Amino acid sequence: MPIITLPDGAQRTYSTPVTIAEIAAEIGPGLAKAAIAGEVNGELVDTCIPISVNANINIITSKNKEGIDIIRHSFAHLLGHAIKQLYPDAKMAIGPVIENGFYYDIAYKDTFSLDDLNQIELRIKELIKQDYDVVVEEVSKEKARKTFLDRDEAYKVQIIDEIPDNETIKLYKHQEYIDMCRGPHVPNTKHLRAFSLMKVSGAYWRGDSNNEMLQRIYGTAWGSTKELEAYLLKIEEAEKRDHRKIGKKLDLFHTQEEAPGMIFWHPKGWSIYQVLESFIRETLILNDYKEIKTPQTVDRSLWEKSGHWDKFKEDMFTTTSENREYAIKPMNCPCHIQVFNEGLKSYRDLPIRLAEFGSCHRNEPSGALHGLMRVRNFVQDDAHIFCTEAQIQDEVSKFIDLVFDVYKAFGFESIIIKLSTRPTKRVGSDEIWDKSEKALADALNIKKFEWSYLPGEGAFYGPKIEFSLKDCIDRVWQCGTIQVDFSMPHRLGASYIDENSQKKVPVMLHRAILGSFERFIGILIEEYEGKFPPWLSPIQVIVIGITDRNSIKCKEISNLLMLRGYRATYDTRNEKVGLKIREHTLQRIPYLLIIGDKEQEEGTVSVRTMHGIDMGSMKLTEFQEIINEAISLKGNYKPVPKR
């Protein structure tokens, strides 16, 4: 007689095994209609699975996160059902849940087009309307293998062959279509309503470029039409802000096939990069960091000593010279230890903070490259702090202040903080890990920040704190980190003399604020939609003449502004002034100074902003006060009418 305990503590006793569907029906018709799965003693199960033991249960609906994932997984199977009806020769591979949706990898002789996606989506909608039950059957490995062998589903057979012989396999049946999965899935297609197929792309079977290329159809699915529409609106907004499109439109950068994953910075894009670098450099100087520069290529022996050769060899670019093998550095830390190792260090010298705008190369798969966001060559705002164990908390605390100051300068207010703790495989004693994790947690708690743990997600050499930005359309970008390292200083022979004249190994803190310049600029392009605040804008001011008579004055004012440190230019083309204003507004130039005969005679400029605000006529000195204030606000600048 199973005793069932509900989330509110209420208990129900049954004389025979009972299912989630039956329990939900007893509680009420509304819950019975909404139930899509159950959680039994912490394990997710289908609504039809009998419960024969005492259990704590939770009934899962589309309002639960688990429920949304179940809906998405069920949609993947429904996609498979529709594909096999429309394209019987297609072979189904895998169809997992991903963030905000699902995908299915499919082998098919023809390339799926957008028209094909529309037809598949229509067939899915037709199947949903049939409100059929999804039937689950648990079978032996042998029966599952025969089922898919009979259906000529070679990819499913490959997966089954890797499952231990004594395991059972769940088959989920959508009418004539059969798929396999751990489950659970929705009990009926009536729970599958809000979805959209998004795109199709190529994907290698099992992610291995030596295997055949499959076609991956992506979809999104939600618990309600309202949630789906909100997500599609967010996707539309993200596409509008795509840094690759804006970068091309504003002539900031480009990539090309001859240098995959490498950025060609154009003058305006490089201007943004230089402003960013100068800002970070000034900030580091004020926080007692010493800037260094280390080599791009280093003999493989150093990477073997540091441990990178064993773990990252496949991701490293290498070259040879005079029978020696070199790696183009994928990270800066081993080289920073070489700088620390030059000369004897005392405990009185610590902490030592070494910073570098280090150019790194990593051999990312070509299919993963994405504009500025995922590249093969990138520059990190990298630094390493060499300190004692006792100094960890204080150094972390100072770095947290630094991170928040920098992010605030760009206008980011919502910061998500996570602390990654010790993994199963690690170096260092439990005592050192205890101290380090406590030091990081205490540093966060003293600041009274909200944060959460990522258990087991730390590196093998130490725990870390991750700082992620939430942008204006609620996307999360992981940028800053500070990570404790007990291993590498020891491996590479770093040491200092302590107060007892004994040689000791320093702790090394890896830290970055932006992560990489390329990716952070990509984030900024999308955050600002190319409408950079004046301090970052490649061109801060353009002086526009109304007629040829104003050309000389335009050039004079532009040159004067440049001499005073502003990024200024002029437009004296023989075009209508309205056309010129429109063009430069579309180029997102913050301030447009218009000069006609009246302004030239009065010694004034007429000021407009890229946001369409007419600030009226004023003396150049008055305009300088306005732009100086705007620049001083950095990323917190907001366009306002003339005061």
Curated annotation (Swiss-Prot):
Q: Does the keyword Zinc apply?
A: yes
Cofactor dependence is on: Zn(2+)
- This chain belongs to which protein, by name? Threonine--tRNA ligase
The chemistry this enzyme catalyses reads: tRNA(Thr) + L-threonine + ATP = L-threonyl-tRNA(Thr) + AMP + diphosphate + H(+)
Quote the function comment for this protein: Catalyzes the attachment of threonine to tRNA(Thr) in a two-step reaction: L-threonine is first activated by ATP to form Thr-AMP and then transferred to the acceptor end of tRNA(Thr). Also edits incorrectly charged L-seryl-tRNA(Thr).
Instruction: State the Gene3D superfamilies in the record.
Output: 3.10.20.30, 3.30.54.20, Anticodon-binding domain, Bira Bifunctional Protein, Domain 2, Threonyl-trna Synthetase, Chain A, domain 2
Q: Name one GO molecular function term.
A: metal ion binding
Tell me where on the tree of life, at the top rank, the source sits.
Bacteria
Chain positions covered by the region annotation Catalytic: 242-533
This protein's GO cellular component annotations are: cytosol
Alphabetized, the UniProt keywords read: Aminoacyl-tRNA synthetase, ATP-binding, Cytoplasm, Ligase, Metal-binding, Nucleotide-binding, Protein biosynthesis, RNA-binding, tRNA-binding, Zinc
Which biological processes are named by the entry's GO terms?
A: threonyl-tRNA aminoacylation
Q: Which PROSITE patterns match?
A: AA_TRNA_LIGASE_II, TGS
- Which organism was this protein described from? Prochlorococcus marinus (strain SARG / CCMP1375 / SS120)
Q: Which family does it belong to?
A: Belongs to the class-II aminoacyl-tRNA synthetase family.
The record's listing under PANTHER family reads: THREONINE--TRNA LIGASE, CHLOROPLASTIC_MITOCHONDRIAL 2, THREONINE-TRNA LIGASE
Annotated residues for binding of Zn(2+): 333, 384, 510
| Subcellular localization | Cytoplasm
* SMART domains assigned: tRNA_SAD
The EC number of this protein is 6.1.1.3
Record-linked InterPro entries: aa-tRNA-synt_IIb, aa-tRNA-synth_II, aa-tRNA-synth_II/BPL/LPL, Anticodon-bd, Anticodon-bd_dom_sf, Beta-grasp_dom_sf, TGS, TGS-like
* Cofactor binding: number and manner: Binds 1 zinc ion per subunit.
Q: Which residues form the TGS domain?
A: 1-61
Q: Describe its assembly.
A: Homodimer.
